[in-house]
Curated annotation (Swiss-Prot):
Keywords, sorted A to Z: Ribonucleoprotein, Ribosomal protein
Organism: Mycoplasma mobile (strain ATCC 43663 / 163K / NCTC 11711) (Mesomycoplasma mobile)
GO biological process: translation
Highest taxon of source: Bacteria
Biased composition (Basic and acidic residues): 56-65
GO CC terms in record: ribonucleoprotein complex; ribosome
SUPFAM superfamilies, per database record: L35p-like
Pfam families referenced in this protein's UniProt entry, alphabetically: Ribosomal_L35p
Name listed for the protein in its UniProt record: Large ribosomal subunit protein bL35
Region (Disordered): 30-65
Length: 65
């Protein structure tokens, strides 16, 4: 009898998120790599820091991880 195959995590997603000790998902903001002169100071400042994903999006991540 054959063993079940393990589900592998999507490496693209695994490289972009971190799971905190409390189980929250942290990710970085997009639109920071170039063309910064066209973006407002507020947009650049607020995208410096990572943010936590909303819990309603966890269901989508579960299949990918």
């Amino acid at each position: 009898m054959m063993a079940k195959n393990k589900m592998k995590p999507k490496k693209a997603l695994a490289k972009r998120i971190k799971i905190s000790s409390t189980g929250k998902v942290k990710f970085g903001h997009a639109f920071r790599s170039h063309l910064a002169q066209n973006k407002s100071t507020k947009q650049k400042r607020q995208s410096k820091h990572g943010t936590f994903m909303h819990p309603t999006d966890y269901k989508r991540l579960k299949d990918l991880m």
